[in-house]
């Protein structure tokens, strides 16, 4: 890549690499604050998340975190990761879009999301917004962004607590089968907006803040869309 493209001053990875990946569990406390914001008692959110955070930490420990970092060093290409800030941006962006559109049923949630260029592009290659729990005519109830930011998936037990707090629909980037089944048990609808497409929105919102004249070369699943 360094030889072919030339003049690449910086490689930005969205997903964490190096010590950022090794410490991914450190950002998961953010989910406690988010769940409290959506009405889950903070003591319950904290107890459930602390257990999950330890599980994630153990899962990360054997990984080869420095592989990409070492390759960048050998090629003399600066490398940085920007994960949670971008996820925070897309969570806010999608939440504001849905608040404005005020969908009443899940079909309308999908329609609202598909108006966003990154999701529209993802739709063309078969990975657009999808319903993982619930039918198109199901009412949304209270919509929460509990599966967008916070490092990685939280505790599977949290869906019942979200339901108890009045949540009706969860918007996420991705969801494991175990988590999906727990959401289904709690009678919570799950809309999966898409992973790389959601990441692309967050990265695009950040890239749009770069000063004019900075050339951006999209790759590795990044869908570039300029908003200003």
Model-predicted segments: where are they?
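Active-site catalytic microenvironments in core metabolic enzymes, especially phosphate/sugar-handling
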Residues: 1-228
């Amino acid at each position: 890549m360094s030889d072919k493209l030339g003049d690449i001053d910086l490689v930005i990875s969205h997903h964490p690499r190096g010590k950022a990946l090794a410490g991914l569990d450190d950002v998961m406390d953010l989910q406690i604050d988010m769940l409290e914001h959506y009405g889950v008692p903070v003591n319950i959110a904290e107890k459930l998340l602390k257990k999950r955070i330890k599980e994630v930490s153990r899962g990360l420990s054997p990984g080869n975190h420095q592989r990409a970092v070492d390759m960048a060093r050998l090629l003399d290409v600066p490398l940085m990761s920007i994960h949670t800030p971008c996820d925070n941006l897309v969570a806010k962006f999608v939440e504001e879009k849905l608040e404005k559109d005020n969908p009443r049923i899940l079909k309308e949630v999908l329609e609202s999301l598909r108006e966003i260029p990154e999701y529209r592009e993802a739709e063309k290659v078969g990975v657009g917004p999808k319903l993982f729990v619930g039918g198109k005519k199901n009412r949304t109830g209270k919509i929460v962004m509990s599966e967008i930011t916070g490092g990685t998936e939280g505790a599977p037990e949290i869906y019942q607590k979200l339901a108890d707090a009045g949540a009706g629909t969860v918007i996420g980037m991705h969801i494991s089968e175990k988590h999906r089944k727990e959401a289904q048990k709690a009678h919570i609808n799950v809309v999966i907006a898409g992973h790389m497409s959601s990441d692309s929105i967050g990265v695009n919102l950040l890239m749009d803040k770069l000063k004019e004249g900075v050339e951006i070369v999209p790759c590795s699943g990044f869908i570039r869309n300029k908003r200003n």
